Amino acid sequence: MKYLLSLIIGFISLSLSANEISFNNEKVNYKVMYKWGLVNKQAGTATLTITNKGDNYITKLTARSDPWADKFYTVRDTLNGIIKKAGFLPMFYEKKAHEGGEFKHDIVKYSRSGNKVLGYCTRIKRDEDEAKGTKKEHIISTTGTTVDMLSVYYYMRALNYDEMKKNQVMKLTIFSGKRKELLTIKYHGTENVAYDNKSYNCYHISFTFTSDGGKKTSDDMDAWITTDSKRIPVKLEGVLPVGKVQCFCTGYN
């Protein structure tokens, strides 16, 4: 669930470019639905914004669970990021999270030299009953295309899906405040998505997260991105131990 919320609340290939489209100032709202059998109830909301500022994009995600869902699992997340427009390179990532009874504050600052990428990571973590948490700092290193749980939302929108073949697979590294993971993205072609009396023609992609050892770190996720010039992810879906979470776009401006 945490990966899905981070993408809402979320490709190494020389033939693909993350500069196919540029982003104007925008705001996208989502509703987060919990589905299990006949149960289909809104569990939360999320809002993503991106602002042009000189050579950079300033990004932000806020997400919160609805009051009834707070009784089972509270979510109050804020993610902030800075992306360099040239090359679409993440420069800074921050996540302030209250999930369940746990509080986390992650910061990643990027450094690049040629194809090498370093992430200077700080994590502060505490439980609800702790007055002061623990702080850990470490450095993550990798090579090639690298994103985080916020910048990947915009990176996947900027790819040229029209040049991809069905079932084509792309790989890249994704940083969190704790570790790096391999993100595998598979393109499934175009599909129609309908909800709230509207329908959208979309590119369908799926995500798989694995550790350095190749072990899956979460269940697969799916996203549907409109084929028009706005490239809005109108639907995201992830499987939970019981039921699944679906996120639907409810507004764009």
Regions found by a protein language model. Give the residues of each.
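Active-site/ligand-binding surface loops and adjacent short beta/alpha elements
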Residues: 114-176
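Positively charged n-region of N-terminal signal peptides that target proteins for export
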Residues: 1-4
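Acidic, serine/threonine-rich low-complexity disordered tracts
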Residues: 19-112, 158-253
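Hydrophobic h-region of N-terminal signal peptides that target proteins for export
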Residues: 8-17
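Short non-domain terminal segments
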Residues: 9, 21, 86, 145-147, ...
